[in-house]
C-alpha cells in the first residue's frame, strides 16, 4: 500500500541525463541524513506545516504503486523501443538488478547484463535492429530504431562486470552477432 500520509518536509534532486538509479540513490542518501536532522529541528521548533500529498499532485495526476520488478521485466526490448527508451531503461536498472539481453553470437546464445550505455545518433536503417557493430577493440554499438546504443559496461553470464575495452580483449563477435 502506498503511504498517503501528509508530507512534513521534502527536498528535490535533479536527475541528470547520465544518472543511473545507483547515482540517484547516492544523492538521496546524502541529502536524506541532512533532511532528517533539519526536519527534527523544525518539529522541535514547531515550524512544520504538513501538506496533503494530493495537494502536491498536478491536475489529473494519480499516485500509483511501483510495479514489482521480475527477471523478465529487466529484459531489454531492442525491437519496439527507441534509443532514448532503451538508454533510460538501462539507467533505471543499473546497478541493480541490471538490464539484460541475449547475445546471439554464431550458434551460441549468451545472457549479458548491461550496466552502462550511451546514446549514439546516426542512421541505423541499414542494419537489422539488435545488430552489433564493433571495432573488435573498444566499441560495441547496437542498432536500434532511431540510432545506436553504445555499450560501455557489461557482464557476461558467469563472468565479472567489466568495461567494454576489457571485454573485447578476450571476446570475438561472429559475423552476424546481435542482441535480441
Predicted region positions:
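Internal anion-binding site segments
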Residues: 58-180
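Donor/substrate-binding cores of folate-linked one-carbon enzymes
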Residues: 1-65
Amino acid at each position: 500500500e502506498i503511504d498517503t500520509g501528509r508530507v512534513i518536509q521534502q527536498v528535490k534532486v535533479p536527475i541528470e541525463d547520465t544518472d543511473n538509479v545507483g547515482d540517484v540513490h547516492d544523492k538521496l542518501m546524502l541529502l536524506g541524513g541532512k533532511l532528517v536532522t533539519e526536519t527534527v529541528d523544525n518539529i522541535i521548533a514547531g515550524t512544520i506545516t504538513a501538506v496533503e500529498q494530493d495537494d502536491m499532485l498536478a491536475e489529473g495526476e494519480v499516485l500509483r504503486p511501483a510495479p514489482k520488478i521480475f527477471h523478465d521485466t529487466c529484459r531489454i526490448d531492442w525491437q519496439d523501443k527507441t534509443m532514448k527508451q532503451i538508454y533510460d531503461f538501462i539507467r533505471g536498472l543499473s546497478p541493480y538488478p541490471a538490464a539484460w539481453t541475449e547475445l546471439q553470437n554464431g550458434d551460441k546464445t549468451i545472457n549479458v547484463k548491461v550496466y552502462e550505455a550511451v546514446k549514439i545518433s546516426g542512421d541505423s536503417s541499414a542494419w537489422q535492429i539488435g545488430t552489433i557493430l564493433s571495432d573488435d577493440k573498444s566499441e560495441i554499438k547496437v542498432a536500434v530504431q532511431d540510432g545506436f546504443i553504445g555499450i560501455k559496461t557489461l557482464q557476461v553470464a558467469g563472468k565479472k562486470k567489466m568495461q567494454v575495452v576489457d571485454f573485447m580483449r578476450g571476446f570475438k563477435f561472429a559475423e552476424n552477432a546481435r542482441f535480441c
